[in-house]
Amino acid sequence: MSFCAFSRYRTKVALNCLLRRQITTKRRNMSKHSIKTVWKENNTFSTNIDGHNIVIDLGEDQGGQDQGPRPKQLMLAAAAGCTGLDVISMLRKMRVEVEHFDIKVDAELTEEHPLKYKTMKLIYEFKGDDLPEKKIERAVKLSFENYCGVLAMYKSCVPVSYEIKINED
């Protein structure tokens, strides 16, 4: 191998190595989340997540100003949003068109402090013409058992169940 060919080879190897390092660094950054929550006044906090502002507060009956949802309710919304994104994405890939899709989350709190959820149930509600039950059941089951990271965290410490309703009123 001539010196020029060897030099080109070393340059190519170095570039590939650098590119791999950049991709690995990018992956590492994507696997970490960081947020900042700022106290505004009284019991009101503000959190900015990727440019989306969320106000967190207590109800007036709890000494707050009711300017935003409560933290535990946001946890339920995160669970519903996570599994909902999974399910609707899988249904699209399965070429299933739904007209309406809701997820209701019922969770029961403990009676003693710290108040935490002791059970959780997700109710997936679908509406549409000629919806294929098997595909819907498969999408929900895959999200519930394999893909939704928020539900995986919940299931590690709380019994979580689900129900599917198709074209029910």
What is the role of each PLM region?
Residues A5-Y9, T25:
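Generic detector of N-terminal low-structure segments
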Residues L85:
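Short glycine/serine/threonine-rich phosphate/pyrophosphate-binding segments
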Residues V13, L19-Q22:
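Juxtamembrane/membrane-water interface recognition
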Residues I23-A77, I88-D169:
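Extended beta-strand/beta-hairpin segments
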